[in-house]
Every structure is written in C-alpha cells, then in structure tokens.
C-alpha cells in the first residue's frame, strides 16, 4: 500500500479511495476512505450489467445490511456485503466500565442470543479470576441459553417465512417466541438484553413457581413444533424455494471460517457443546443434528431439529437443578445481599436495602465500593467460546490487573458467516439471494457491534 500523497481526484488522476499519509507531531498518520463497492459500481459502467443496492432499509436485509449486486439479467455476477451501519462501539465501551457492568453492554450485540453473550463474557472473567460458578448456577445458565436458542431459531423461521411469502409461518414463529420471552421476562424483568448472568454466577435464584412455568412451556412447544413440519417441511413451494439454493460445501465453510448450523448443514458435526464442553454440557444427553445438503433447506431442517434437542436439554436441567447457591461465596466478587426486585419491578426491594443497611458500617462501605468501583481481576488474557444459535461466539478478554477490562474482542459468528454470502449467491438468481441471506441468519447488532 502506497503511503505517498495521492493525485487530486478532481483532476481525474489517481485512485480517490486508496491510502494516503501525512506527518504530524505524533508521527505518521494514515487515512483510508471509501470502499470497494464504489469501484465495483464504476467497473460496471458502460457494460450491459445492472448494479442493484439491496438495503440498508430493505425489510429482508435482516437489519441495516447493504448488499451490492451486479446482475446480468436475473443472474448475480458479483455480490458485496457493506456493513457498519449499526456500529455502536461496544467493545470499546466495555473498557470504560467495571467487569460486572460489561455484561450490560455485551448482551446488546447479538440481541437474539443475549444470554449466550453474557455467559461467554462472564466465563472469561471467571477464568481470569480463577473461580467457577456454583453447580446450580451452571445448570441455570444452560437452561437459559437453550431457551434463548429456541427463541432465536423461532425468529429465523418467522423472518425466513415472511421473506418467502409464508406469512402464516411468520405469525406461528413469533407466537411461540412470545412464550420464551414471557419466561425470560418473568425471571429477569426484561424481554431482551437481560444482564442476568454475572461474573461468579447469576443475579438471583429461580422463583418458586418457575419450574412449573418451564414445564408448561415445554408442553406447549411439544404440541406446536410438529405443526412446522406440516406448514413448511412438506410444502412443495417452500421446498422448491430452498432446495439447492445457497449451496456452500464443507471445504468452502472451512476456508471461510463458517460455524454453527451452516457448517453442520455441510456435514461436519462441530458443536462446541460436544467438542469443547462448558457449563457441564458433557453431562447432558443430546444429539448434534447434521446434514449433507449444504443448502438453505438443510439449514432449515437442522434448526428445526435443534429446537427439539434444546427442549430435551431443558428437561434435563430441571431434573439436575439441585439446591445450592447461585453465586460464588467470595465477598470480593459477590454482593453482600441477594438482589431482589421491588413490587413495582423498577428497583431494589426494601428487604435488599434493609439487609445491607442493617449490617456493620464496614459492610456498607464494602458494598458501596464493590458496586461503584468493582473488583480487581488478575492480569492475563483468555479466550472462551460458546455455541450460540449462529455458531462459535468467542470472547478474548485481556486484563491489566485493574477493575476494568483492558481489551475485549468478540469473535462474532454473524460477522464471520456473512462473508460466505457472495460464495452462496454468485451465479444464482436474485430471488434466491433472499433465501440465502435468511439461511445465514445474521444479526447486525453482532456484525457491526
């Protein structure tokens, strides 16, 4: 890459989108602007091709995603993904918060799998601290992650059906998802972005009637999931729209770093819950669905079966849930009183405040400093991955020994998987690009973060 100043683009010389540099009092500063999609459009000028900008406002773009397609008739010759419209600087923001406050940021990236983000981040912090969440909290986390996985796959079905014109499937998917959100809201007070998993465990224990509510949910899902087979699997139009569309074989997945249902649909049974167990997943009996179809239809069938397996895991969680604490006993990490929500659902209950205020002055000071300043984490760096609904979600966390992270980098599966889209759609029809994008199931909050 040249570092020499560029020719004036107004004079028609040089590339206005290459790199330039200049000397400052702090050293050499490099500037890069523009993007290859502009060159892509310019290359097509004068040829019998048409360039279409799909998004970022299109309802089928799965958020603010821009796709640039170069077409010959109805066939896509070139495709480019343009991202960054939903950048929120979460990784940088976490560096300015305490370790516990970081949970409230990471839960907002992949907003369809918030509990997976929270768990992966907290596991990384716990690994740096050298502590392990109590068994009850581990089981608790597994149950919440599987509920979140079901909710995410239901959104995949609902939005994918809507984009294919199957509006009945959309209403079915969002109807079942509401059941999951009701469960999570009853427990955490929020439908999404829960910030419920904490370093050392979880925020609070299960309500007394929560077990029965989960059993009722399982009963509802067992009765309703077969309807998806009747509505989609045996539907000839649905099958024709997805079969042999968005083909991505195993070697392509491996070269692009694709994980999750897209990789398993190509025949590789790579699921971190099995190959690198965490949170006690090695003690649960469940299958990892795979296929060799490597197309949109195989990914649909795979996610449908994964919901059945998640229900199987949730049943085992309820059986394994033994009495015990849900937070480590280390007073330097855990708050001195169990957090309970007030009757209005908006703040701490009087019992919570009374327990803190009723202790010694030293306990009150410790609580105040623990909440406002946070706890110290020994210096070091770790990488902790979990299996999210979209693939390998990994957290690389670096500590310099202080009360805040020095660096948090996220290996986001939506970001990695999205780069496979050109390989899936180039050479295919424009109408099939919608199905291919839906089968990747990207969440732009995680892609752009």
UniProtKB/Swiss-Prot annotation:
GO terms for molecular function: NAD binding; NADH:ubiquinone reductase (non-electrogenic) activity; quinone binding. The keyword NAD applies. PROSITE patterns: COMPLEX1_49K. The keyword RNA-binding does not apply. GO terms for cellular component: plasma membrane. Pfam families: Complex1_49kDa (PF00346). Transmembrane segments: none annotated. It is a peripheral membrane protein. NDH-1 shuttles electrons from NADH, via FMN and iron-sulfur (Fe-S) centers, to quinones in the respiratory chain. The immediate electron acceptor for the enzyme in this species is believed to be a menaquinone. Couples the redox reaction to proton translocation (for every two electrons transferred, four hydrogen ions are translocated across the cytoplasmic membrane), and thus conserves the redox energy in a proton gradient. PANTHER family: NADH DEHYDROGENASE [UBIQUINONE] IRON-SULFUR PROTEIN 2, MITOCHONDRIAL (PTHR11993:SF10), NADH-UBIQUINONE OXIDOREDUCTASE 49 KDA SUBUNIT (PTHR11993). NCBIfam families: NuoD (TIGR01962), PRK06075.1 (NF004739). This is NADH-quinone oxidoreductase subunit D. It comes from Saccharopolyspora erythraea (strain ATCC 11635 / DSM 40517 / JCM 4748 / NBRC 13426 / NCIMB 8594 / NRRL 2338). The lineage of its organism: Bacteria, Bacillati, Actinomycetota, Actinomycetes, Pseudonocardiales. The gene is nuoD.
């Amino acid at each position: 890459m040249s570092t020499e100043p560029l020719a004036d683009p107004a004079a028609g010389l040089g590339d206005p989108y290459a790199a330039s540099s200049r000397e400052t009092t702090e050293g050499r500063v490099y500037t890069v602007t523009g993007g290859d999609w502009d060159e892509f459009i310019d290359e097509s000028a004068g040829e019998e091709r048409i360039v279409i900008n799909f998004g970022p406002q299109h309802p089928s773009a799965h958020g603010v995603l821009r796709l640039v397609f170069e077409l010959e008739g109805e066939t896509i010759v070139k495709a480019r993904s343009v991202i960054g419209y939903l950048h929120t600087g979460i990784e940088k923001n976490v560096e300015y918060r305490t370790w516990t406050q970081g949970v409230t940021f990471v839960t907002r990236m992949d907003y369809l799998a918030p509990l997976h983000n929270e768990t992966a981040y907290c596991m990384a912090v716990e690994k740096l601290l050298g502590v392990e969440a109590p068994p009850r909290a581990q089981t608790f986390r597994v149950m919440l992650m599987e509920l979140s996985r079901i909710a995410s796959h239901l959104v995949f079905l609902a939005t994918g059906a809507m984009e294919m014109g199957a509006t009945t499937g959309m209403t079915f998917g969002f109807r079942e998802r509401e059941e999951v959100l009701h469960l999570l809201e009853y427990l955490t007070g929020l439908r999404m972005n829960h910030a419920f998993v904490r370093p050392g465990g979880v925020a609070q224990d299960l309500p007394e009637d929560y077990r029965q509510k989960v059993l009722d949910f399982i009963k509802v899902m067992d009765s309703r999931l077969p309807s998806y087979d009747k509505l989609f699997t045996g539907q000839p139009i649905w099958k024709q729209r997805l079969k042999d569309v968005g083909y991505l074989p195993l070697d392509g997945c491996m070269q692009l770093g694709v994980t999750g249902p897209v990789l398993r649909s190509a025949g590789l049974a790579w699921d971190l819950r099995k190959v690198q167990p965490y949170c006690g997943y090695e003690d649960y009996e469940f299958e990892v669905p795979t296929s060799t179809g490597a197309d949109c239809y195989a990914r649909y069938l795979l996610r449908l079966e994964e919901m059945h397996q998640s229900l199987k895991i949730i049943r085992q969680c309820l059986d394994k849930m033994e009495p015990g604490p849900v937070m480590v006993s280390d007073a330097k990490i855990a708050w001195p009183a169990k957090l309970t929500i007030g009757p209005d659902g908006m703040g701490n209950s009087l019992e919570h405040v009374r327990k803190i205020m009723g202790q010694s002055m030293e306990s009150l000071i410790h609580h105040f400093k623990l909440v406002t300043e946070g706890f110290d984490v020994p210096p070091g760096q770790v990488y902790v991955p979990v299996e999210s609904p979209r693939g390998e979600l990994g957290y690389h966390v670096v500590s310099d020994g202080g009360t805040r992270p020095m660096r948090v980098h996220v290996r986001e599966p939506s970001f990695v998987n999205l780069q496979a889209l050109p390989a899936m759609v180039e050479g295919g029809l424009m109408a099939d690009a919608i199905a291919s994008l839906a089968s990747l199931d990207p969440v732009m909050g995680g892609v752009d973060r």
